């Protein structure tokens, strides 16, 4: 299963490291990543592969939400199919 993860918040040291380390702990592979800083705001979108994940999708969602709170950013995850359906032009 592939999923899209978005991260948005005020820029500070450790956001990418914090998100990527928790994904690695859950055996989630980052297939593609794009990040940008817009003035003082950090934005990142990742395409991930959960096929080897050691936890359920709901657990991944919970863990990312908790990590986001610790980092002071919003982290959202969506199934790639749902993301594509919602963002089709």
UniProtKB/Swiss-Prot annotation:
Superkingdom in the source lineage: Bacteria
CDD domains: ACT_1ZPV
Pfam families: ACT_6
Matching Gene3D superfamilies: 3.30.70.260
InterPro entries: ACT-like_dom_sf (IPR045865), ACT_dom (IPR002912), UPF0237/GcvR_regulator (IPR050990), UPF0237_ACT (IPR022986)
Residue ranges of every copy of the ACT domain listed in the record: 4-78
Family to which this protein belongs: Belongs to the UPF0237 family.
PANTHER family membership: UPF0237 PROTEIN MJ1558
UniProt-listed HAMAP family: UPF0237
UniProt-recorded name of the protein: UPF0237 protein CA_C0478
Species for this entry: Clostridium acetobutylicum (strain ATCC 824 / DSM 792 / JCM 1419 / IAM 19013 / LMG 5710 / NBRC 13948 / NRRL B-527 / VKM B-1787 / 2291 / W)
């Amino acid at each position: 299963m592939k999923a899209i993860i978005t991260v948005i918040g005020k820029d500070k040291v450790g956001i990418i490291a914090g998100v990527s380390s928790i994904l690695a702990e859950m055996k989630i592979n980052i297939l593609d990543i794009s990040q940008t800083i817009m003035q003082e705001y950090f934005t990142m979108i990742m395409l991930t592969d959960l096929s080897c994940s050691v936890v359920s999708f709901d657990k991944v969602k919970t863990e990312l939400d908790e990590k986001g709170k610790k980092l002071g950013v919003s982290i959202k995850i969506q199934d790639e199919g749902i993301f594509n359906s919602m963002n089709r032009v």
